[in-house]
Amino acid sequence: MSQSLRPYLTAVRYSLEAALTLSNFSSQEVERHNRPEVEVPNTSAELLLQPMHISRNENEQVLIEPSVNSVRMSLMVKQADEIEQILVHKFTRFLEQRAEAFYILRRVPIPGYSISFLITNKHTESMKTGKLVDFIIEFMEDVDKEISEIKLFLNARARFVAEAYLDEFVY
């Protein structure tokens, strides 16, 4: 893990731990319904808490939107060049197609972000909050590492193919 990634992930960890103090809150509009208030458009202001924006640089950001009974966390994965943009897009599409396996993963991310998670009070009741935070932090580390490894492999493969192609022209 790079030295600049460690403080970024630490800030995300502490912010998530603070935001995941969720409680059961019934809907104010529909009886016997409990819906994530952060997902409801035009919800009352007292149910939404102050959003937190944590940025490592202009290309890597986290938006944590807490409410009284849910937290939506959106990640912008690093996309320094066109290759990384393509890799991140393919990688996140692959994960979003398997959203059922990740209980907290949203199928469609917030516009401007690569991937989003939705954690409700039911998730914090059935799973340990510390383990949820650990999963998200480990997920962020793994995505960063995977994108870097795939990019290195892709560049090595392109170099090999270019050398093989150019060897045809050497006499």
From Swiss-Prot:
GO terms for molecular function: actin filament binding; molecular adaptor activity. It is found in: Cytoplasm, Cytoskeleton, Actin patch. The keyword Transport does not apply. GO terms for cellular component: actin cortical patch; actin cytoskeleton; Arp2/3 protein complex. InterPro entries: ARPC2/4 (IPR034666), ARPC4 (IPR008384). Pfam families: ARPC4. Component of the Arp2/3 complex composed of ARP2, ARP3, ARC40/p41-ARC, ARC35/p34-ARC, ARC18/p21-ARC, ARC19/p20-ARC and ARC16/p16-ARC. Functions as actin-binding component of the Arp2/3 complex which is involved in regulation of actin polymerization and together with an activating nucleation-promoting factor (NPF) mediates the formation of branched actin networks. Seems to contact the mother actin filament. This is Actin-related protein 2/3 complex subunit 4. It comes from Saccharomyces cerevisiae (strain ATCC 204508 / S288c). The gene is ARC19.
